[in-house]
Amino acid sequence: MAAKNLPKVFFDVAVNGKPSGRLTFKLFSDTVPKTAENFRALCTGEKGTGVSGKPLHYKGSHFHRIIPGFMAQGGDFTMGNGRGGESIYGHKFNDENFTLKHTGKGVLSMANAGPNTNGSQFFITFDKTPWLDGNHTVFGQLVEGNQVLEILEQHGTQSGMPTAKVEIVDCGEIKN
């Protein structure tokens, strides 16, 4: 099966400096290769420094927006507040397609500011979110770490402001 060849990446997460576990994702490089490659390379940090002058790497960044029952958003490694980030292709890149849907918990999708504004920000769903279909590119799925995702959700608020610092302390690719 082609599924065995899909890349896998991980985030090691800490809450207020305390290790909380690992999130492992498979990336749908067969359906959205450009989007999956952007995320994979940002997990490894292999592309060096971006146009912002910051490393193209999720390590050390945090989840700046967590809403229980909805999603956890992160990936802004340039500003840290949800207003920054950049892709490995430059600042932003176009929506690749909307083939994959937001069907349940653990869906990995691109956060954006409208059509064709993908950078480095992403979100992980806590439930199905069909209203996002056609507006956000799904490119991965959580395959291990449901307990860690639940810890993230526990630190969310309805406003989205996390109740703790939820940081990606390490990340990378898991070779098959």
From Swiss-Prot:
GO terms for cellular component: cytoplasm. GO terms for molecular function: cyclosporin A binding; peptidyl-prolyl cis-trans isomerase activity. SUPFAM superfamilies: Cyclophilin-like. InterPro entries: Cyclophilin-like_dom_sf, Cyclophilin-type_PPIase, Cyclophilin-type_PPIase_CS, Cyclophilin-type_PPIase_dom. Disulfide bonds: none annotated. Its EC number is 5.2.1.8. GO terms for biological process: protein folding. It catalyses: [protein]-peptidylproline (omega=180) = [protein]-peptidylproline (omega=0). Keywords: Isomerase, Rotamase. PPIases accelerate the folding of proteins. It catalyzes the cis-trans isomerization of proline imidic peptide bonds in oligopeptides. This is Peptidyl-prolyl cis-trans isomerase cyp5.
